[in-house]
């Protein structure tokens, strides 16, 4: 493991030149304090755990100090926002500090969010507030722990610097780690501004650096796009299976790597509600929970348009056509596993859809239902869960079908089935009210709850002594919270 001054930088994106990003130095925030750090994320950089305790750590990730090898850049991109094209966006408050090359041979972007104004700030102050920084940190880390592809969060640093949103708040910075910060909107920018050479350069960069195995295929760019489709199908399947609602699926928030990216007004479902909208600015429900699947496919079509100089339209359409069947296969497999089933049967899709309909009509807690279903032998668990449903007759019919379906498995004991279920059904998720409680304490200078919640969420499938309060249904005030994009 390394000290902070021993990190090895290899800034591949910066070398693409000024057409792709602008050199900008971070604007420091005052009186920086470390709120929380993720040792597992920092280990991706080969950083020794004790490095986060050093004053230098908070100084670097608050913009006061910088490695001599770092080359902070604000990246340019555009994107479709709520379906309408915005021709010029870019990093308005975040900077790609550089790329660290670790001992495993991986490159990791160090992106500092809240680092101040850039040429793309669009009248903004370039700052991120403490509450949104904490939310992004916790979301990144719990998604990773759940096995959902995501950018990582290294740390959050708070400050005394005031910023104005709806009210006065404190500025903060969050360190985001990802193997690329290229977005769908990055390619869209050069396509729509009619810069074919730059578009080709960026496409080659993505292909060479992030999809090198596709270079061996007869049509490398088509192979790359197909893999992007496949990755997004699997990603969205995991979102839907675990009840994650992103909230702002604009194409500038879609990673070229097929990972969860750019956290804003996200939420995990409390009660199951397929029409849930977590973003209070989404008046039409474009990015509602149930719309995430078609929107992901729409976004892939937007990316495909930017790739038409390299791939035929027919081939792109065929690749996009793979998305829905791939998604459905991944989703059904995940839901099958959540129900403790290991062998595919034709009635599985109906079994899942009937359950979700019953949950929707009864307002059943989505996470706790699956966890409790694996707490006991099936017959006992179903008797316990029966009281959560309004349509008792409907639930009894489903329970009978579920037990018959288990009988078809002939695969191990009841205890083995329960063990399998606990390995895929979390006890703890990031509920918005839990995040809000931690944020409220942090805004008063008490970071203990943020750190405790982070530790609980790092092992979401394992029951932790004394942490039962994090595995409860939310209070009435904490349900169905809609979150502002203001951050």
Curated annotation (Swiss-Prot):
**Binding locations of Mg(2+):** 253, 262
Which sites bind ATP?
90, 92-93, 113, 125-126, 176, 183, 262
Which is one Pfam family of this protein? SelO
Q: Which UniProt keywords apply?
A: ATP-binding, Magnesium, Manganese, Metal-binding, Nucleotide-binding, Nucleotidyltransferase, Transferase
The terms under GO molecular function for this entry are:
AMPylase activity; ATP binding; magnesium ion binding
Which reaction equation describes what this protein catalyses?
A: L-seryl-[protein] + ATP = 3-O-(5'-adenylyl)-L-seryl-[protein] + diphosphate; L-threonyl-[protein] + ATP = 3-O-(5'-adenylyl)-L-threonyl-[protein] + diphosphate; L-tyrosyl-[protein] + ATP = O-(5'-adenylyl)-L-tyrosyl-[protein] + diphosphate; L-histidyl-[protein] + UTP = N(tele)-(5'-uridylyl)-L-histidyl-[protein] + diphosphate
The cofactors named for this UniProt entry are: Mg(2+); Mn(2+)
Per the record's keyword annotation, is Cell wall biogenesis/degradation included, yes or no?
A: no
Tell me the superkingdom of the source. Answer: Bacteria
Question: Which catalytic residues are annotated?
Answer: 252 (proton acceptor)
What EC number(s) does its UniProt record assign?
A: 2.7.7.-, 2.7.7.108
Q: Record keywords: ATP-binding included?
A: yes
The family annotation for this protein states: Belongs to the SELO family.
Q: Which purpose does this protein serve, as stated in its record?
A: Nucleotidyltransferase involved in the post-translational modification of proteins. It can catalyze the addition of adenosine monophosphate (AMP) or uridine monophosphate (UMP) to a protein, resulting in modifications known as AMPylation and UMPylation.
- NCBIfam families documented for this protein: PRK00029.1, PrtAdtaseSelOPseudom
Provide the protein name: Protein nucleotidyltransferase YdiU
| Species | Pseudomonas syringae pv. syringae (strain B728a)
The upper taxonomy is: Bacteria, Pseudomonadati, Pseudomonadota, Gammaproteobacteria, Pseudomonadales
């Amino acid at each position: 493991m390394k000290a902070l001054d021993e990190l090895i930088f290899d800034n591949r994106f910066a070398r693409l030149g000024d057409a792709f990003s602008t050199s900008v130095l971070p604007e420091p925030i005052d009186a920086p304090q470390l709120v929380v750090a993720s040792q597992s994320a920092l280990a991706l950089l080969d950083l020794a755990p004790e490095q986060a305790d050093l004053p230098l750590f908070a100084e670097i990730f608050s913009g006061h100090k910088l490695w001599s090898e770092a080359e902070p850049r604000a990246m340019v991109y555009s994107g479709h926002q709520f379906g309408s094209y915005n021709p010029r966006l870019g990093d308005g408050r975040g900077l790609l500090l550089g790329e660290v090359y670790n001992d495993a041979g991986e490159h990791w972007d160090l992106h500092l969010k809240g680092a101040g104004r850039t040429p793309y700030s669009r009248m903004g102050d370039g700052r991120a507030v403490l509450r949104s920084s904490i939310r992004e940190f916790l979301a990144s880390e719990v998604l990773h722990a759940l096995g959902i592809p995501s950018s990582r969060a290294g740390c959050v640093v708070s400050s005394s610097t005031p910023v104005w949103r709806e009210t006065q708040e404190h500025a903060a910075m969050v360190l985001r780690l990802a193997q690329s910060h290229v977005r769908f909107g990055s390619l869209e920018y050069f396509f729509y501004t009619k810069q074919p050479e730059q578009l080709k350069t960026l496409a080659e960069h993505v292909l060479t650096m992030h999809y090198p195995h596709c270079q061996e295929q007869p049509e490398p760019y088509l192979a790359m796009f197909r893999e992007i489709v496949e990755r997004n199908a699997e990603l969205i399947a995991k979102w839907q299976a675990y009840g994650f609602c992103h909230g702002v699926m604009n194409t500038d928030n879609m990673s070229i790597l097929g990972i969860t990216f750019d956290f804003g007004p996200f939420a995990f479902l409390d009660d199951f509600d397929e029409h849930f909208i977590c973003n209070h600015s989404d008046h039409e429900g474009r990015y509602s929970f149930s719309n995430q699947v078609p929107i992901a496919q729409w976004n892939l079509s937007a990316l495909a348009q930017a790739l038409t100089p390299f791939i035929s339209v027919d081939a792109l359409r065929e690749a996009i056509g793979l998305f829905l069947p791939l998604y459905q296969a991944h989703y059904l497999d995940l839901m099958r596993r959540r129900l403790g089933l290991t062998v595919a049967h034709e009635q599985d899709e109906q079994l899942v859809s009937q359950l979700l309909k019953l949950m929707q009509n009864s307002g059943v807690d989505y996470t706790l239902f699956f966890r409790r279903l694996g707490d006991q032998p099936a017959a006992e668990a179903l008797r316990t869960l029966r009281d959560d449903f309004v349509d008792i007759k409907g639930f009894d019919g489903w329970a009978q079908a579920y037990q018959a379906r288990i009988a078809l498995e002939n695969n191990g004991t009841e205890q083995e089935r329960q063990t399998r279920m606990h390995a895929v059904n979390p006890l703890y998720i990031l509920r918005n009210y839990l995040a809000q409680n931690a944020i409220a304490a942090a805004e008063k200078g008490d970071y203990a709850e943020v750190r405790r919640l982070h530790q609980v969420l790092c092992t979401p499938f394992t029951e932790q002594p004394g942490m039962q309060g994090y595995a409860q249904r939310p209070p009435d005030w904490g349900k169905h919270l809609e979150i502002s994009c203001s951050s």
